[in-house]
C-alpha cells in the first residue's frame, strides 16, 4: 500500500494522473480538454455576479430607498438562499420560452448566457450586501457631506465619491467568490448539460472512472 502511494505521489509530481478506465486516455489530457469550458463559465459568472451585486448595492442606497431597498434586499436574500440547481431549472424553462430548442437564441442562452446568469446570481447577494455596507459607511463621511453642500447630486455622489472607497472590501471578496463559483460549476454544468470539469466529475463518478474522479479532486 505504501509502495502504491509512493508511485502515485511520484506520478503526481510528473503530472501523470494515470489513464481513464472508460476511454483509456491519459487523465491529464482529459482534464486539460475540459478546463477551458469551466474557466470560461466561472469568469462569465463572476462578471454577472459583480454587475448584479453592484447594481443591487447601488439601488439599496438611493434617495428613494423606501421603494428600492425592499426590492434590492429581497433579490439579494433570494440569491443567497436559492439553490443553484433549482434556479438552473427555472432558467431553462425561461430559456425555452425565448425560442424553440433549435433556434439561435436558445442555443446562445443555453451555451453560456443562462449558465453564467444562474452561477453569477448565486453570488451577487453577498456582493450586494458588502457594497451596501461599504457605501453606507462612506455616505456618512465628512467629505460626502461636503460634496452634498457643494450641490453635487445624489447619483454622481454615489458613483464618483461613495463607490470608489467602498471597492476595497469587495475586491478582497472576489477571490472567495471566485473559488465559490468554481465549485458551483459542478452543479451548473450538470444541470445545463454543458461540457466542463464539473460535468466530467459527475460523469466519471457515475461511470466508476475513479482515476478521472481522483485527478479532478486532486
PLM regions: where:
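An internal, D/E-rich "acidic patch" concept
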Residues: 1-54
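Membrane-water interface segments at the C-terminal ends of transmembrane alpha-helices
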Residues: 7-10, 74-103, 118-123, 129
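Alpha-helical transmembrane segments of integral membrane proteins
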Residues: 31, 35-68, 84, 104-218
Amino acid at each position: 500500500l505504501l509502495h502504491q502511494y509512493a508511485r502515485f505521489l511520484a506520478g503526481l509530481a510528473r503530472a501523470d494522473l494515470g489513464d481513464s478506465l472508460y476511454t483509456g486516455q491519459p487523465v491529464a489530457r482529459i482534464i486539460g480538454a475540459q478546463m477551458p469550458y469551466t474557466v470560461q463559465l466561472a469568469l462569465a459568472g463572476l462578471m454577472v455576479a459583480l454587475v448584479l451585486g453592484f447594481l443591487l448595492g447601488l439601488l439599496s442606497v438611493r434617495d428613494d430607498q423606501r421603494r428600492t431597498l425592499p426590492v434590492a434586499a429581497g433579490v439579494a436574500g433570494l440569491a443567497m438562499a436559492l439553490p443553484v440547481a433549482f434556479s438552473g431549472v427555472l432558467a431553462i424553462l425561461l430559456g425555452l420560452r425565448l425560442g424553440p430548442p433549435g433556434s439561435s437564441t436558445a442555443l446562445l442562452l443555453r451555451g453560456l448566457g443562462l449558465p453564467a446568469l444562474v452561477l453569477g446570481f448565486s453570488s451577487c447577494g453577498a456582493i450586494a450586501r458588502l457594497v451596501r455596507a461599504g457605501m453606507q459607511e462612506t455616505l456618512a463621511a465628512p467629505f460626502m457631506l461636503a460634496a452634498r453642500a457643494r450641490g453635487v447630486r445624489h447619483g454622481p455622489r454615489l458613483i464618483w465619491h461613495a463607490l470608489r472607497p467602498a471597492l476595497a472590501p469587495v475586491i478582497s471578496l472576489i477571490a472567495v467568490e471566485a473559488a465559490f463559483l468554481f465549485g458551483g460549476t459542478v452543479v451548473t454544468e450538470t444541470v445545463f448539460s454543458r461540457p466542463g470539469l464539473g460535468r466530467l466529475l459527475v460523469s466519471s463518478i457515475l461511470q466508476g472512472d475513479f482515476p478521472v474522479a481522483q485527478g479532478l479532486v486532486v
